[in-house]
């Protein structure tokens, strides 16, 4: 196809000097970088992005109501955004995941990790033969039909289920959607396998796409610290860490969550793996309140797993989130026996590893304890981070020895 035969897209013109991030292949254009839009573009429609002199930079999706005015589909001027484009992106992602699944014996993994797989705003998780789709940006929603067609080409034997029922869609003027797209409806609880564990996943009603695949490697690492130990599993959700701790030979694991439904599934997961249910306790409570109550009653643990939900959605919330992370980690440190292990995580993208480490250090000072950092964690390998988009590294964690 010659350049003259390409579709003529509306042009997003950047202000002078605001093209530097695109020249470094960062996939976002913020509102402050925009000079004007030449031509008419509907929400999510494909546009060309040019500098102030009209030089072509990238091709992306238009979102006039978002702070991120455009998300880049491609830096290749010869690529049209069509079914063939999405098929190529899926094949690229599929190659890595197929190798990883074979190497690690996985039946469930993240197939598409948004910007890091060249598909901004697109999240796809595979659970067995179900593909769970989340479209988080206007461009992704606009290309829904093309993306689904490409998925059917690459994964003809898989059913597709939509979980685009996340609040972030409202920021770009989109309604929340959920339901079957192709194939049969997922069962109420779908069994998957992870590092020797059998785990039940609620695709239709669970958090995100049903399960936190990004913590797969951290759950496995937990086993090295828990033998004959008393473990506190905070924000336990459906008990992945609890099952792993029991498989690692812990003396007891106490799982805490505010959701009774999640705790019920956690209990079923322990039973499904034929583990000793008498070693597992399930507590429905607010973690902050319970930790304070434990402190008042002199409760002690040997290992504490701290895997809270995202505390910060935007920069204005960062300071408050820092206080929350500091408070909860201080409480955990106070509850640990000397030589105890704190496995603590943050899934907030705006929280850098350096800042998170400083927060833990400050929490240790407030707790009056010395802490050694002994291991660092990140999201599993099916959640890659492309070099030009460091924001893709959202999950970070530390193993800390509390003196």
From Swiss-Prot:
Pfam families, alphabetized: Methyltrans_SAM (PF10672), PUA_3 (PF17785)
EC number: 2.1.1.191
Keywords noted in UniProt: Cytoplasm, Methyltransferase, RNA-binding, rRNA processing, S-adenosyl-L-methionine, Transferase
UniProt cross-references to InterPro entries, sorted A to Z: PUA (IPR002478), PUA-like_sf (IPR015947), PUA_sf (IPR036974), RLMI (IPR023542), RlmI-like_PUA (IPR041532), SAM-dep_methyl-trfase (IPR019614), SAM-dependent_MTases_sf (IPR029063)
Subcellular location field: Cytoplasm
A GO molecular-function annotation: RNA binding
The reaction(s) this protein catalyses: cytidine(1962) in 23S rRNA + S-adenosyl-L-methionine = 5-methylcytidine(1962) in 23S rRNA + S-adenosyl-L-homocysteine + H(+)
EC top class, as a word: transferase
Ranges for domain PUA: 9-88
GO cellular component, one term: cytoplasm
Entries under Gene3D superfamilies matching the protein: PUA domain (2.30.130.10), RNA methyltransferase domain (HRMD) like (3.30.750.80), Vaccinia Virus protein VP39 (3.40.50.150)
Family listed: Belongs to the methyltransferase superfamily. RlmI family.
Family annotation (HAMAP family): 23SrRNA_methyltr_I
Role noted for this protein: Specifically methylates the cytosine at position 1962 (m5C1962) of 23S rRNA.
The name this protein goes by in its record: Ribosomal RNA large subunit methyltransferase I
The organism of origin for this protein: Salmonella typhi
The encoding gene: rlmI
